[in-house]
Amino acid sequence: MQQAALVGHSMGSLIALEAAARSPQRATRLVMVGTAYPMKVSDALLNTARDSPLKAIDMVNAFSISSLACKPSYPGPGIWLHGANRALMRRMQAGQTGLNLFLHDFQVCDRYANGLQAAASVSCPTHLILGSLDQMTAPKSAAPLAAALQAQVHMIDSGHCLMQEQPDAMLASLKASLA
């Protein structure tokens, strides 16, 4: 593949940013979802992730979803977004032997210090899709990055889990970003 549109959510948005900066000739679009820069993680969450990853999963789950009752019956009757997210995070954590995946990923986000320098190297059209109710990556924390990238910002009435909370609005914003 010679060229691609790069899309990432949260930590993945920083990865997409870095990839677009390192190979600007290959990035046709950059879409950063649920992003912030710097993407600092609180000491309380870092310490909890280190000492009690399952408790940190519960904390993140509470901070990432803005409603107890998201889109009716997402993705179908009987599904509970909070429970599904918790189960997925626990499964990912348990699948790593010898590595505290939750702590590792938070440390990567917390320590990433190349955002504005990377933004200066990005030459493709860039869009930020943000959740207006996001407590993990607050929209105001994305403002310096949006300015540096001259990005178009799409705001969705959602928390950090935009894809699950507002799938239709997220898809519409993504389609507009890639058009």
Where are these predicted regions, by residue range?
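Alpha/beta-hydrolase fold nucleophile elbow
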Residues: 1-9
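Conserved alpha/beta-hydrolase catalytic His-Asp/Glu region
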Residues: 47-121
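Short alpha-helical segment within the catalytic ATP-binding CA
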Residues: 10, 14-15, 136, 161
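Hydrophobic "lid"/C-terminal helical patch
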Residues: 106, 170, 174, 178
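Flexible "cap/lid" loop of the alpha/beta hydrolase fold
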Residues: 14-63
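Glycine-rich phosphate-binding loop signature in dinucleotide/nucleotide-binding domains
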Residues: 1-2, 122, 177
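Conserved loop-alpha-helix segment in the C-terminal half of the alpha/beta-hydrolase fold
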Residues: 121-158, 164, 169
